[in-house]
């Protein structure tokens, strides 16, 4: 007897799946983007469940019929002989997909199907199956399209990518059947038969290496699965099933070489070993903690297969370019005679490899469209797009501009004891970056390109940027840090973007300051306010100085070194602790200074303290949950300035600054106070190209205004 089946798969794998299923004995009747339809006997069905490496689900088609309305769906499900599929004492669940004019909700559709099944059994013997949505013994699929209802029984009960060996995964897990597809596209079974080795330098939890070992050793992926729905199928033949399982176990064969996985994260390497042990392939594989540039082949011939990180946003993509350049260099230098298969969603990262692909295949990692690039690593496949490759005409213009800026600003920075400064700020509009130097590091902040710029053009410019910057500035590629600068909303301004906690010390005049180039979009030091900070370095000893919205209190460090007594207010405990570290770094006695964690607006309303100098530099916008209200600097600057002026001694000075480019000072403030726009005096040499980086005002009471 033959059964009608539908075997689903990940998008893009349908024809690869068709070949696999034909090899396992399925008579294919139709191929669709969702999967493969076919006819199979019971032994073939069991072999599909045991041996398919690519399938998601294997569904036994039970019946189909016209059913536009609720009553028709219920009638079809009541009339079907469910006792030929399972008995009433089994637990069930329904997955419903599709809709009609009357049935628009999948939960409602599932309820109708379930009611039909229950009513059938009640009429048959007065009993009914129970529903278990979490772990049913019988999973029924119902699909309604064009008023045709198709109902099927899930023979395994869950997706076949769940082999049973992976209890935990790394940050970006690759599904087992997608990993298997990568290996099949890379011709791994044929290569393994010839004694080739295998190496995954980004192994994570080990999925690719484990799947490769199971293929090479001819281990059926279904052997590890427990509690499958076919065990509860009324037509299940346990003796035949066990016979085929035994035959599968007998087909396992040894490997001539160990397959290798490496990763820089020791925790995921340990996880990979645990997964390999559960899969029964631990003797066939080897997992080590190793950096990419330390990777070396263990055999003369082999396959490098990997799923490196490939960020989904443009800023993430460009930050990964150096990693892909290093991968290309390592493959070309150390893996001659090998094959390679590399999965990425980004053409710019594929290009950054600098190696020519023989073939490309489209695969989907979840919803993300990716390309698998298959390469032959040989002397004929020359390495391109390396840091030393010839520059395009546009890239050469960028190089010339950076070199010119470097020659000018380096001398100025040395003369003024400055080790952190802006060297480039979208000087050439097509290369929309700001580049800041911190000692021997460069932080590249990529302005989000307008929607009118095609993604491939933006990515090409990004790749050229990363090619040019190390060469023009004499900076090692590993010391480039790429971030994407965009208009920030709410708490985004201070949100973490990483967890490296790598700090550095920079110099600014007499002050030493701590910066973190990795963990946040901002580094802990606003370079454009340097001249304001240096102005505070000239305060008289004993000056009472308030730094409101103090951030890491770098301005206060300069003031304290001059002998001022500082009060530093900020809502963030993280930044206040950072501020205290800045003070300690400069051997400043903390007992003479205050670090207060408050909502600055609320604190200014209630404090009775008075100050000689106040620096007020609020964010342009903030909606932090810990604030009593949303801060919008254009709307709120009048009240903030009034509150700050209340805290000044009669002859005191308020310096108000904002980075809101379109900021307009409310005219009434000039009627109430003596206001001087000192923005030009606060723009240092490295920001002359972008004089609108901030607005700065000196505000005093009218009778203390400068004559």
Curated annotation (Swiss-Prot):
GO cellular component, as recorded: cytoplasm
One of the Pfam families matching this protein, by short name: UPF0020
Localization: Cytoplasm
Reaction(s) this enzyme catalyzes, per UniProt: guanosine(2445) in 23S rRNA + S-adenosyl-L-methionine = N(2)-methylguanosine(2445) in 23S rRNA + S-adenosyl-L-homocysteine + H(+); guanosine(2069) in 23S rRNA + S-adenosyl-L-methionine = N(2)-methylguanosine(2069) in 23S rRNA + S-adenosyl-L-homocysteine + H(+)
Domain of life: Bacteria
NCBIfam families: PRK11783.1
Family annotation (HAMAP family): 23SrRNA_methyltr_KL (MF_01858)
Name of the protein: Ribosomal RNA large subunit methyltransferase K/L
Gene that specifies this protein: rlmL
């Amino acid at each position: 007897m033959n059964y009608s089946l539908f075997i689903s798969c990940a998008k893009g794998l349908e024809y690869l799946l068709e070949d696999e299923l034909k090899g396992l004995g399925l008579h294919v009747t139709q191929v669709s983007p969702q999967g493969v339809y076919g006819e199979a006997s019971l032994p073939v069905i069991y072999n599909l469940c045991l041996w398919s490496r690519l399938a998601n689900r294997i569904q036994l088609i039970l019946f189909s019929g016209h059913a536009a309305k609720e009553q028709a769906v219920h009638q079809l499900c009541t009339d079907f002989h469910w006792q030929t599929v399972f008995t009433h004492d089994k637990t069930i669940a329904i997955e419903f997909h599709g809709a009609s004019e009357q049935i628009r909700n999948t939960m409602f559709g599932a309820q109708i199907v379930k009611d039909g099944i229950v009513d059938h059994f009640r009429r048959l013997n007065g009993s009914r199956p129970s529903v278990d949505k979490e772990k049913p013994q019988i999973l029924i699929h119902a699909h309604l399209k064009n008023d045709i209802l198709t109902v099927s029984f899930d023979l395994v009960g869950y997706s076949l990518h769940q082999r049973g060996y992976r209890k935990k995964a790394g940050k970006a897990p690759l599904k087992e059947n997608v990993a298997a597809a990568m290996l099949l596209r890379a011709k791994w079974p044929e290569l393994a038969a010839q004694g080739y080795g295998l190496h995954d330098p980004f192994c994570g939890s080990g999925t690719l290496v484990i799947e490769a070992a199971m293929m090479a050793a001819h281990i059926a992926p279904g052997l590890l699965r427990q509690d499958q729905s076919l065990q509860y199928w009324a037509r299940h033949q346990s003796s035949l099933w066990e016979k085929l399982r035994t035959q599968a176990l007998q087909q396992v064969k040894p490997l001539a070489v160990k397959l290798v996985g490496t990763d820089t994260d020791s925790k995921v390497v340990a996880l990979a070993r645990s997964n390999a042990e559960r899969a029964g392939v631990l003797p066939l594989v080897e997992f080590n903690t190793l950096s990419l540039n330390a990777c070396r082949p263990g055999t003369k011939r082999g396959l490098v297969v990997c799923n490196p990180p490939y960020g989904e946003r443009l800023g993430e993509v460009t930050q990964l370019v150096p990693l892909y350049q290093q991968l290309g260099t390592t493959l070309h230098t150390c893996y001659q005679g090998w094959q390679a298969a590399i999965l990425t969603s980004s053409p710019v990262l594929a290009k950054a490899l600098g190696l020519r692909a023989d073939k490309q295949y489209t695969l989907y990692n979840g919803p993300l469209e990716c390309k698998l690039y298959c390469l032959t690593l040989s002397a004929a496949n020359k390495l391109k797009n390396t840091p030393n490759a010839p520059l395009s005409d546009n890239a050469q213009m960028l190089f010339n501009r950076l070199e010119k800026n470097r020659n000018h600003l380096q001398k100025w920075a040395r003369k003024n004891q400055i080790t952190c400064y802006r060297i480039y700020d979208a000087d050439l509009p097509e290369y929309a970056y700001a580049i800041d130097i911190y000692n021997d590091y460069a932080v590249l902040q990529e302005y989000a390109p307008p929607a009118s710029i095609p993604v491939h053009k933006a990515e090409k410019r990004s790749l050229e940027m990363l090619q040019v910057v190390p060469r023009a500035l004499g900076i090692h590629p590993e010391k480039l840090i790429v971030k994407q600068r965009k208009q920030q909303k709410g708490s985004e301004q201070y949100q973490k973007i990483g967890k490296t906690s790598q700090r550095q010390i920079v110099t600014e005049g007499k002050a030493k300051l701590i910066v973190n180039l990795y963990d946040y979009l901002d580094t802990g030091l606003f370079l454009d306010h340097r001249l304001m900070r240096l102005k505070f370095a000239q305060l008289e000893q004993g000056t009472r100085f308030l730094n409101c919205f103090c951030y890491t209190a770098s301005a206060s460090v300069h003031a304290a070194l001059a002998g001022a007594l500082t009060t530093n207010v900020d809502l963030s405990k993280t930044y206040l602790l950072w501020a205290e570290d800045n003070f300690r770094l400069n051997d400043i006695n903390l007992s003479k200074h205050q670090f207060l964690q408050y909502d600055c607006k609320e604190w200014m309303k209630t404090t009775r303290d008075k100050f000689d100098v106040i620096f007020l530099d609020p964010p342009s916008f903030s909606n932090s949950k810990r604030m009593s209200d949303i801060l919008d600097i254009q709307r709120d600057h009048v009240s903030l300035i009034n509150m700050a002026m209340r805290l000044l001694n009669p002859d005191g000075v308020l310096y108000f600054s904002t980075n809101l480019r379109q900021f307009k000072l409310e005219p009434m403030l000039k009627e109430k106070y003596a206001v001087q726009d000192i923005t030009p005096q606060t723009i240092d040499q490295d920001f002359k190209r972008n004089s609108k980086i901030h607005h700065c005002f000196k505000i005093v009471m009218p009778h203390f205004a400068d004559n």
